[in-house]
Each structure stands twice: as C-alpha cells, then as structure tokens.
Amino acid sequence: MERQLDDLRRLGLTWDGPVVLQSHRLPLYHKAIDQLRERDLTYPCFCTRKEILQAPSAPHAPDGAYPGTCRNLSEAERAEKSASGRSPALRLRAGIDSFTVHDELFGEVTGPVDDVVLLRGDGVPAYNLAVVVDDGAQNIDQVVRGDDLLTSAPRQAYLAQLLDIEPPSYAHVPLALNSEGKRLAKRDGAVTLADQLEAGRSTEQVLTMIASSIGLAEPGEVVTPPQLADRFDSRKIPRTPWIFPAK
C-alpha cells in the first residue's frame, strides 16, 4: 500500500482525509450484516467454489453466479452440513434477479443480482459488502474504476439500497492492457511508476502519457493534476482499452 500512496504523491495527486484500512472497520461491516440478518436477508452457505462452478445455473446467469443451492435448506439440512465441520459463508438473500444503475460511459446498465457472499467462511467480510459499507461511511458519491467491475455495480447498488445507503454514481473506464490484450504483468516490462522512472521517464512525462491516453492532453504536453481536473470530461474518455507501451 505504501508504494501506491508514494506513487500518487510523486504524481502530485492528493486525497481527502486519512487513509483508512478495512481491517480497522470490522465493527461497521458486522453492524451492516446484523441489519440484514434481522430482516431475514441472510443465510449460511456451505458450498465450495468448485461445487458452485459445477452446479447448473439459471438461464442467462453469468459464469460463477451462485445457483442458490443452500438458500432454502431446512434447519435439519443445515445442522447436518454444520456437523460435517465445514464453516459456512453468509450470503445475501436477494429479493430480485436484476438491478439497473446509471454509468457515465455506458448509460443505463441492467445487470444480474445473485446471492452474494457477505461474510466468508473464515469470518472475513467479503468484498461486495466492504466496498458498499466503506462508500456509505465516507459519503462517497462517485466511483470511477475499471470496466472489468461494471457487472458488480448492479449488485453493489442493490446492496447499498438494502442498507439505506445512497448508491454512488458510476463511471467504468477501459483498462490498460498489454499488446496481447491481457492485463499488465511484470513480464510486460516497465509497468509501475518506479519502473518508468528507472527507464528514464520523469514523473511529468508519465503524467502526460496517462493524460493523453484519455484525451486530456496532447502527446508531450506538460500538464499538472489541477489542470487535468479542470479539463476532465467523461465524453473524451476512449471506449476501448489503452494498449500500454510498457517496453
């Protein structure tokens, strides 16, 4: 984490408030789970990842969507599974199959909502719950992230609604990929800021490279973060991935 924070500082990017660790916010997550449990919106799930992938899913459901195997188990069936020694996860009992959100780049997006995990079998709050509670606690009103998470937005916005949290607005942007159209990795060369600096680029050049990739600067133009904030326009952001010139 310190490396990422240092990279932001080098690029001249700042943030509001202190850096908050999720490991310090466990009471908030458990409070949210209690809210849902009190409304009978949770249930224990004993399925393994392999069992979920092998189970038949509903028509049009995305790969890996939970098929509801443990949703309607009787108390006797739950007791039998508990006796086997397997620690259950806790899932949301979703009341809908889909939910619609507005995205700055994609417009109205309707996506499937399944019974997401709220608490893992090892007792750790799950990602979908944590990010929703974090956004609510910090009054986040806009989320900008990679478009690989677009399908997560409907279920997260639905969960926020159940917890009386105002869902944020969304902007899902294309990813930076390698020449083969895959996620960047160490084998692709200088993919971190430290790598770029070691290769001879300045922080100003790196900032310009990033800004020009989303239409906010001309190649070679020297820009600052405040200038980019003033220029930002979601309509300028390309709708296709940026092929990163790592090597």
What are these regions (language model features)?
Residues 1, 26, 49, 63, ...:
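Alpha-helix initiation and N-capping motif
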Residues 1-59, 147-165:
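N-terminal Rossmann-like or analogous alpha/beta NTP/dinucleotide-binding catalytic cores
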Residues 16-18, 167-170, 217-223:
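Short, surface-exposed acidic
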Residues 21, 48-50, 173, 209, ...:
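Residue-level "edge-of-site" marker
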Residues 37-38, 136, 197, 211:
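Alpha-helix boundary recognition
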Residues 50-186, 192-197, 245-246:
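Active-site cores that bind ATP or allylic diphosphates and position pyrophosphate for catalysis
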Residues 80, 97, 182-247:
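Non-catalytic terminal extensions that flank enzyme cores
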